[in-house]
Amino acid sequence: MGGLTISDLVVEYSSGGYAVRPIDGLSLDVAPGSLVILLGPSGCGKTTLLSCLGGILRPKSGSIKFDDVDITTLEGAALAKYRRDKVGIVFQAFNLVSSLTALENVMVPLRAAGVSRAAARKRAEDLLIRVNLGERMKHRPGDMSGGQQQRVAVARAIALDPQLILADEPTAHLDFIQVEEVLRLIRSLAQGDRVVVVATHDSRMLPLADRVLELMPAQVSPNQPPETVHVKAGEVLFEQSTMGDLIYVVSEGEFEIVRELADGGEELVKTAAPGDYFGEIGVLFHLPRSATVRARSDATAVGYTAQAFRERLGVTRVADLIEHRELASE
């Protein structure tokens, strides 16, 4: 088995007519038998990456090879076969059929793959026993706890013995006892030739991982001194869809704030002159930059951490930062 190899992956989509890149140039090698944690807040690209790995979303460029097959090139019957035979997905909201019992839910992918009813039933029974739900086989989702429903979802995901397991926020909405049950189960799946990729914002899962991929940069120290940046006319200070940890105040010259459009063009949002600031939303809410900023002329900007900028502005409320109050004089 060749494991998982991601090379220079770029995912781009249109949001309100603008081009958004939640993933931009990602590369990653994962050995068979590994558990990979994708860590980051909402909106950082975790679910987008899972969708690409599952063959649900096609990237703009780059490649994803699993077991030495580039899944970004698969189409039609070959893509359907990959999704059915190679991938198992555990959804955040369980996605169980409420009218079916736990046993019947696990049988669904088996029957869809052409497995006989008797063989599907035996396989589903074995899997539910494996996830410690042997006595809950006849229970419907509404009669089960969140942790139990999640274990049914895991059993269903591995019904066809896929070599790639994708889990999206598997501990969301679970109490600490249910979380423990699910964590043990997920760790047990990453054995042999199987690769397990889990998207989460839950740092409690980190000790389980063989590999952790943070889809946002580590936050800088709040005590980091201001950073003065000098740029020539036409040079880019930061690009749309990238992550950042500094809020910038213009001290000299002018900057253009532009948004890249889905058709490849761009739209001028505003021109920032001395005393103006920008980049606060991404920093405060841990979101990718929503626009590209480049120097309209030779210019200078000073970058502040969120805490330092609050002090610079003379406010404590986030709302005051977003509403662009006048800067306090130094």
From Swiss-Prot:
Listed transmembrane segments: none
SMART domains, A to Z: AAA, cNMP
Record-linked SUPFAM superfamilies: cAMP-binding domain-like, P-loop containing nucleoside triphosphate hydrolases
GO biological process, one term: transmembrane transport
Highest taxon of the lineage: Bacteria
Tagged with keyword Cell wall biogenesis/degradation: no
GO annotation, cellular component aspect: plasma membrane
Pfam family, one: ABC_tran
Annotated ranges, domain ABC transporter: 4-242
Binding site for a nucleoside 3',5'-cyclic phosphate: 210-330
Amino-acid positions noted as binding ATP in the UniProt annotation, renumbered to this chain: G40, P41, S42, G43, C44, G45, K46, T47
GO molecular function annotations of the record: ATP binding; ATP hydrolysis activity; transmembrane transporter activity
Keywords: ATP-binding, Nucleotide-binding, Transport
Family: Belongs to the ABC transporter superfamily.
Protein name, per record: Uncharacterized ABC transporter ATP-binding protein Rv2564
Organism expressing this protein natively: Mycobacterium tuberculosis (strain ATCC 25618 / H37Rv)
Lineage, highest ranks first: Bacteria, Bacillati, Actinomycetota, Actinomycetes, Mycobacteriales
